[in-house]
């Protein structure tokens, strides 16, 4: 094993995926995950046992434009060519955007200083087929300005205990949110127009379901169900 370690190199992958058909990133006893698919594909392709480590353990149904992951391997394939070699082996809803060699002590969870999550909403009376898998439908009009104002109360270092799922196992519920943006773009016109509302949350790390609960809270503010003083 010591002899084998001499030839080991660490590779960094940037992974994009559509999370619709996956039970999140992290391997689960019941249900297929992105991590499991990558481990099996890499192990089969490189003919050695691979265990990948991801920066963000995204929840079930969450998509990613660029989750950073690393693995160790003896492969002699040029690092920048790995993405092109691996992508044909992967299902169409997972793609390696880039690949490179990194120092052996590089760890995506500790080197990663910032994460950004987006929560997409279709705001309109008629559900659009193109949005059904990727947006939460809200049929009543949202007050975007109120949502923007409310979001700023959550920026900074706070105890987010009331903004995480009950099964959170984190040692502390204090987290730092560095920015929240709420923006709206037109989706469709006519008698029943629709707009896309995007809630973009950036921070150093998040609790289980924290971004979903923040988004749900801001939706309640936008609907007038919750006032700013309750944030």
Predicted regions mapped to residue ranges:
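Structured-RNA-binding interfaces characteristic of tRNA pseudouridine synthases
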Residues: 4-230
